[in-house]
């Protein structure tokens, strides 16, 4: 209904790609979008953004989670995420076709 539910959000650690609030407002979701293969470096990046959200935006009763979205991951990213709290990785798939006429 015209309500913005996720958008790029400025922080003191850099711009957060998307910051979303759950319908019941119990959760803030930091979303980092990456093209192609995702490096383990992004784990530190999203943790900085999540730290900003915890310190500056979240209320006591709100949970802060992170989601990394990319085309593919690798073993280093999997290892880093295995010990990262409240961060998940999702793969996207693009099937783009162009037809003349």
Q: Predicted segments — roles?
A:
Residues 1-101:
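Charged, terminal alpha-helix-loop-beta segments
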């Amino acid at each position: 209904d015209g309500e913005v539910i996720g958008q790029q959000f400025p922080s003191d650690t850099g711009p957060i790609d998307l910051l979303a609030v759950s319908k019941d407002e119990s959760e803030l979701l930091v979303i980092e979008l990456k093209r192609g293969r995702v490096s383990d470096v992004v784990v530190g990046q999203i943790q900085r953004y999540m730290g900003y959200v915890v310190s500056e935006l979240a209320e006591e009763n709100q949970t802060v989670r992170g989601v990394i979205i990319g085309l593919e991951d690798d073993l280093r990213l999997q290892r880093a995420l295995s010990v990262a709290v409240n961060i998940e990785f999702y793969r996207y798939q693009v099937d783009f076709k162009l037809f003349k006429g």
